[in-house]
Amino acid sequence: MRPAPAILLVAAVLLSLPVTAAAQTPGEVFRKVTPSVVVIKARGSEVTAAGQTRFLETGSGVLISADGKVMTAAHVVATMDEISVEFLGGETVSAKVIASESAADLSLILLERVPAGARVAKMANSDTVRVGDPVYIVGAPYGLSYSLSAGLISARWAPNTVHRAMPLAEFFQTNATINTGNSGGPMFNAAGEVIGIVSHNISKSGGSEGLGFVVTMKTAQQLLLEKKSFWGGIDGQFLSDEMLDILNVPNNMKGFLVKSVAKGSPGDEAGLVGGTKVFTVGGEQFVLGGDIILAIEGVPADSAASMMKIRDHLATLKPGAPITATVLRKGRVLELTGVVP
């Protein structure tokens, strides 16, 4: 007996439909991805009212290449003196920053070596993610390593719409729990592929309130892998006209006040000096005594827009190329020279 034409038509339609992988349970996703997730412990120093103090920052990250590249958040590692990375099996290796973009809260670090058993994560096209999609975050909230939280994509935000200090970041908003220690960790889709890097949450209580923000993988790949944003290893702030007057900066000079410099960073190698004392002016705390950067490569360092131009230029330079910085130090204008790492 020959099949009826209608049955043949239905069969043809079914065969033409795309085949999708079976949905994985949260436990299956967790077991699949944890060999690629790392816990980051970074040591730095800061100036407080009590003087120079050491501190430890704990965050998370994800291994994205066989040669040891790990994506994480800039605020976890960008101005730290020492970075150690712990894998699922407990093995710890040293790492260094090789690219960073504070305007998107992203950093790329390179491991001294890749432990046996570590697994490179698969990165997904974050443009295909939709509001309502299930997501999973693995990290170390409050130092509790390899904790899983689950949720949904709540919204998607274009660059320069959520956080003025991070104008380059496209964000996913999620109700998956994000706490201190999750920063820099990966957010996975239901297939266990990385779709973003955890940045921060918005909270009135200090805990997680369902407003978590994750930088999309599209932004991370563009800034860290394609563009390789320059890492200088410095932290500081632009000086207002009021502060320029208070500090008696001559000739209407404007610039960027250096608060701290990471040991071994390009800024450190160039001879930049960080602050030494904390002062309160108009209710706001400043770490003073450090260099004021007036220009880098001849471009004034007087605003966020000018710093973007500087970063774009530095990203085009090859390793070993010289970098010049004009700084004001104790009333004297100096020219410092460093090199691209």
Q: Where do the model's predicted regions map?
A:
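Bacterial N-terminal signal peptides
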Residues: 7-18
